[in-house]
Amino acid sequence: MAMNTETLSLIKQSIKTIPNYPKEGILFRDVTSLLENAVAYKATIDLLVEQYRNKGFTKIVGTEARGFLFGAPLALELGIGFVPVRKPGKLPRATISQSYELEYGHDSLEIHTDAITANDKVLVVDDLLATGGTIEATVKLIRQLGGEVQDAAFVISLPDLGGEARLTALGLELVKLCEFEGE
């Protein structure tokens, strides 16, 4: 589905770039500036609703923490459930865990064991796609619980970091509202 270029431009322009954060040589794409702009934030959610309405999804899974900011309102608008994937020890019921590689080590994510069933068709939502490690771990969690996941949506993609190729290799169809070059 083609997206309105004027709206996409508004969204992209609302994302501030912070040079040398969190370290020298990095251009940090600050999605919180988009959240501060009510018109751009609503336009973001509206575009995602337009993209995914009537596609048969039963759940949206958002990754900690900024995935919650886009996934939860999208789920509400689509009239489906929202499932948070969190860092270890943050969810109160029984969970399963999936580790993933970081630049300097490992981390892991958890999901409630009863949050996804074999009857669920799941859309994964996050603010930013960089290397794809957190979303790959999230997809593995969903599939381990029997859920069907073939789609992921991002506000920002940094294609130079390899995440798009990593996730398409998992069989995911990706929607990215904005792309930025570099790191």
Curated annotation (Swiss-Prot):
Catalysis: reaction(s): AMP + diphosphate = 5-phospho-alpha-D-ribose 1-diphosphate + adenine
GO cellular component: cytoplasm
Alphabetized UniProt keyword annotations: Cytoplasm, Glycosyltransferase, Purine salvage, Transferase
CDD domains: PRTases_typeI
Gene Ontology molecular-function annotations: adenine binding; adenine phosphoribosyltransferase activity; AMP binding
Family matches, as Pfam families: Pribosyltran
Main location: cytoplasm
Biological-process GO terms, alphabetical: adenine salvage; AMP salvage; purine ribonucleoside salvage
Enzyme Commission designation: 2.4.2.7
EC primary class: transferase
Pathway, per record: Purine metabolism; AMP biosynthesis via salvage pathway; AMP from adenine: step 1/1
Location of this chain's protein in the cell: Cytoplasm
Disulfide bonding pattern of the chain: none
Statement: the UniProt record of this protein carries the keyword Heme: no
Protein function: Catalyzes a salvage reaction resulting in the formation of AMP, that is energically less costly than de novo synthesis.
Family the UniProt entry places it in: Belongs to the purine/pyrimidine phosphoribosyltransferase family.
Quaternary structure note: Homodimer.
Protein name per the record: Adenine phosphoribosyltransferase
Organism this protein belongs to: Shewanella sp. (strain MR-7)
